């Protein structure tokens, strides 16, 4: 088993444990949605998740996807990302990280920059706020769109 598959399975097991601890029933559809989110690096919309899973789950609906995403978000295992357009995207990675977004195709890529965490501490120190989190987005044009 590859390291990536082992990592996905580990994340899935931890997420299922969190759901069970919250009293949430584990269904095959719920597992499939979680597995898709964990293995996806594209920050999918609910519609994209539906398109990917509907061949294997013909009875699944977009409403089922949204309902499960809401449950995952409420428990804290998924983040909902809202941007200028009307569609929400979902990110399994709930740790502090940042996004760079293509202005042409909407592609979202994660990146890490540990020094930005210092900004949170500095803001808290300078304002006496109890800082709970922060969000940073950088916009540009991805390599694929540049090459078109």
UniProtKB/Swiss-Prot annotation:
Q: Enumerate the residues binding Zn(2+).
A: 102, 105, 142, 145
Question: GO MF annotations for this entry?
Answer: DNA-binding transcription factor activity; transcription cis-regulatory region binding; zinc ion binding
Which CDD domains does the UniProt record give? Answer: Fur_like
Which UniProt keywords are given for this protein, alphabetically ordered?
Answer: Cytoplasm, DNA-binding, Manganese, Metal-binding, Repressor, Transcription, Transcription regulation, Zinc
Q: Which Gene3D superfamilies match?
A: 3.30.1490.190, Winged helix-like DNA-binding domain superfamily/Winged helix DNA-binding domain (1.10.10.10)
- Record's subcellular location: Cytoplasm
Q: Which domain of life is it from?
A: Bacteria
**InterPro entries cross-referenced by the UniProt entry:** FUR (IPR002481), Fur_C (IPR043135), WH-like_DNA-bd_sf (IPR036388), WH_DNA-bd_sf (IPR036390)
GO cellular component assignments: cytoplasm
Q: Which GO terms describe its biological process?
A: negative regulation of DNA-templated transcription; regulation of secondary metabolite biosynthetic process
Q: Where is this region: DNA-binding?
A: 1-84
Residues annotated as coiled-coil are none
Query: What is the recorded function of this protein according to its Swiss-Prot or TrEMBL entry?
Result: Manganese-dependent repressor that controls a regulon of oxidative stress resistance and iron-storage proteins. May act as a hydrogen peroxide and organic hydroperoxide sensor.
Family in the record? Belongs to the Fur family.
Q: State the protein's name.
A: Peroxide-responsive repressor PerR
What is the organism field in this record?
A: Staphylococcus aureus (strain N315)
Q: Which gene encodes it?
A: perR
